[in-house]
Amino acid sequence: MDIQRSILIVALAVVSYLLVLQWNKDYGQPELPAASASMNTTQGLPDTPSASGTSSDVPTAQSSAAGSEAADKPVAVSDKLIQVKTDVLDLAIDPRGGDIVQLGLLQYPRRLDRPDVPFPLFDNGRERTYLAQSGLTGADGPDASSAGRPLFRSAQSSYQLADGQNELVVDLSFSHDGVNYIKRFTFHRGLKADCSDKEKAQKKIECINENAYQVGVSYLIDNQSGKTWSGNLFAQLKRDGSADPSSTTATGVSTYLGAAVWTPDSPYKKISTKDMDKEQFKESVQGGWVAWLQHYFVTAWVPTKGEQHQVMTRKDGQGNYIVGFTGPTLSVPAGSKVETDLTLYAGPKLQKHLKELSPGLELTVDYGFLWFIAQPIFWLLQHIHSLIGNWGWSIIALTVLIKLAFFPLSAASYRSMARMRAVSPKMQAIKEQHGDDRQKMSQAMMELYKKEKINPLGGCLPILVQMPVFLSLYWVLLESVEMRQAPWLGWITDLSVKDPFFILPIVMGGTMLIQQMLNPTPPDPMQAKVMKLMPIIFTFFFLWFPAGLVLYWVVNNCLSIAQQWYITRKIEAAAKTA
């Protein structure tokens, strides 16, 4: 019995520690600052010299008549940001280089009490630097010019996806030395028209187009000069070292905020900012992706499949962290045209869409070392939600199904506890008989177990077998963006944050107290005191846990109480009639 209790206490302590480290909430995101194009976006580009410097492998750019004549009736020719809006994205493009410097997620409000303020993903203001950069570098690439990055022209200063329109194309043009460039952004409608407003509000995966948060980026190079053009396509994500504004924990430990890449040896390789502080990462990769992760959301560049790219991470002179890639050398003969493209994903961690975009990208939903158990659990939870339409009730239904699946193991555990409870008077007598002689008391206990055919670990091992599944479910509820701002009923308007009135944690503590009353009292006084404190300790921890986690624990405890009460009464009744 001592061994059983000790193992259970250690297991519960480990689970509690892991849960505290994984607990997150989504308050405190800063407002999107006013648009500003004055920030320096050249710093950190691959093989890019400074504006005042020169580079031995990049010729000095000089304007030409051919370049000026190729301009196609520009309207916006300034450093003013180009605004683009779809039904799911609200973003700004800096004409200086054509970088996406601001991006808000319209379907994911910053807070429930501010539904009109979208969650800010990209930002290049005074408080935070986080942007998606792409361009052409190399021998003739305009982004490698000593004069600085190219200033693109656009036909409009703002673009918006119209009703009934499924695709929005934004072209930026630039001409230099007889070469005409078009940087084309392609945006897509995010929500399906055949879904109701209620289904869209529930963010059902069936109502979200798979390319909703994908931005197609392509370069059209029209070489009208008298020589062959040569350059390389690059893309990168640049972020400063500030904390994730959407994720903090009760202990001050943030969830993973950093880079990740796909490599042939690892479909999901995390590269933290600490790793970038120590050394650069470089590897030649065919296809794959590079990404920057934060709680619930991810941004990723996905190059053309089949092409060889140089993936790298580094830290620039301004303290920004960069993850990106450079593509193979492009060669455009005089009088020819070439197009090269890639895809940017910027949005929530929707596993189905991420997996379809590029293999391994769905692993950015980081379920920890038990991901192989967590992913099937999430798959089942998502299918239940497609039928029920409420994540709170879906959690309850999933808890019931898991409890049914482990019913035989749980029943074995409770039967063992019931037998221990039945012989507890004999155990107490042994304790009183041998007093402080622990060796004799242990020998007498083992003889009692053997005589009564009781396995002291019989009630513990079944619980330990189930623990990986329970822990995986916790991580599913913690890391899945579907839980963010998802209501259940009544006062629970967001399953991803704490219960505002602490009702569920108090109920959870009550269920733990009832469970304790059904279990036999430990013979060791110290263990008995520790077990009595467990409901209080857990209630305190769970006061700040996401309501979805506490809901799972409450339902699981209630089912366990019912099962244990039934089995215990059945065994006691059989003992009386024997």
Curated annotation (Swiss-Prot):
Membrane topology qualifier: Multi-pass membrane protein
Main location per the UniProt record: membrane
Subcellular location: Cell inner membrane
Membrane-spanning parts: 3-23, 361-381, 387-407, 457-477, 500-520, 535-555
One Gene Ontology term, aspect cellular component: plasma membrane
Entries under Gene3D superfamilies matching the protein: 2.70.98.90
Pfam families per UniProt: 60KD_IMP (PF02096), YidC_periplas (PF14849)
Molecular function GO labels: membrane insertase activity
Record flagged with keyword Transmembrane helix: yes
Task of the protein: Required for the insertion and/or proper folding and/or complex formation of integral membrane proteins into the membrane. Involved in integration of membrane proteins that insert both dependently and independently of the Sec translocase complex, as well as at least some lipoproteins. Aids folding of multispanning membrane proteins.
Binding partners and assembly: Interacts with the Sec translocase complex via SecD. Specifically interacts with transmembrane segments of nascent integral membrane proteins during membrane integration.
Family affiliation: Belongs to the OXA1/ALB3/YidC family. Type 1 subfamily.
Record-given protein name: Membrane protein insertase YidC
UniProt organism field: Pseudomonas aeruginosa (strain ATCC 15692 / DSM 22644 / CIP 104116 / JCM 14847 / LMG 12228 / 1C / PRS 101 / PAO1)
